[in-house]
């Protein structure tokens, strides 16, 4: 289908990297959009061409309601009342991913999930490159997708958040996968978890091959002319699954052993699931499985994902700043099997999530919990006997440094967004790394 944007009133919401890429996209087509950013001082304001009309501060209602097409940045909720009103009037509200999907015919692998998206997307990119593809990685990681249209590629790998999928309707992926869905971003969705889940699952709508995760006893849908289903997961009712033999994880494909994880550099069940999914994707792309396995054996993981950043006096400092939801913190705690004390740094913006699931882990293990940030005080009430509240991450680390002993682990796995006190999770993780080395 061909889309004609000429003669339409086009409005771009948001002046981050996504918004700037949207401006450039339309300017190359000879179209001048309008732009609104809710901030009075957006960081990319100096990148707006002089002839572009823009407004800063609150969303300008008359600009929104007189538009024919609105492109919304992922940081702006599509459930704002003014945008819901615009939608009810028949105004199209779409993402940059939707614009991108209308323009390209190159094969796309799309990956979403609450946790593990970046890791799996990066694994698949590395495997595809070793298999001879010219690969571009974008979406929620790497390039803004519209910038990728200007570069040569034989395959796109997209990491997609629920925010991006909210307003994406025509993404025709060769392969689409939802890694997992657990509570996150509930402050964004008026109807709660089910709405968040539905948004994630929409990635399958126009995909050719759907990789789905089955729980015990579940069955995958029947293949149709337009869709093929491949399953993965922990249970052996999946096409790809994990089995433990003497506490060692073995990866299987249809009852055939394909990977012994004792030969893999990454540890932890969540990482074994990421590896399994990457193999399933690679097999569906018909990459040489030996090449895929060799890449995965050498993969060291991504920064800020359960990364040991400092060891001194037999005290380990683990940076898991990318842990921005409850489930990722739970996975980090399950990974740690030590005789010493775990000093957990937990806190930030909890995004209305339910943290009660962590209680049983706190009660079973030798742990001290230092809660900080916007929701730190409430988090400290989860397990009062083992918790201390501080305003900032730095204050918590200073207190911990006076008490840690050889054999202990200091774990930054906040389970929360960093936006209350930091620009992003990277800034939070980098502060942790800096302080771990200074204090020791």
Swiss-Prot record:
SUPFAM superfamilies: MurCD N-terminal domain, MurD-like peptide ligases, catalytic domain, MurD-like peptide ligases, peptide-binding domain. Pathway: Cell wall biogenesis; peptidoglycan biosynthesis. ATP binds at residues 113-119. It catalyses: UDP-N-acetyl-alpha-D-muramoyl-L-alanine + D-glutamate + ATP = UDP-N-acetyl-alpha-D-muramoyl-L-alanyl-D-glutamate + ADP + phosphate + H(+). One of its GO terms (cellular component) is cytoplasm. Its EC number is 6.3.2.9. Pfam families: Mur_ligase_C (PF02875), Mur_ligase_M (PF08245), MurD-like_N (PF21799). It is found in: Cytoplasm. Keywords: ATP-binding, Cell cycle, Cell division, Cell shape, Cell wall biogenesis/degradation, Cytoplasm, Ligase, Nucleotide-binding, Peptidoglycan synthesis. GO terms for biological process: cell division; cell wall organization; peptidoglycan biosynthetic process; regulation of cell shape. GO terms for molecular function: ATP binding; UDP-N-acetylmuramoylalanine-D-glutamate ligase activity. Belongs to the MurCDEF family. This is UDP-N-acetylmuramoylalanine--D-glutamate ligase.
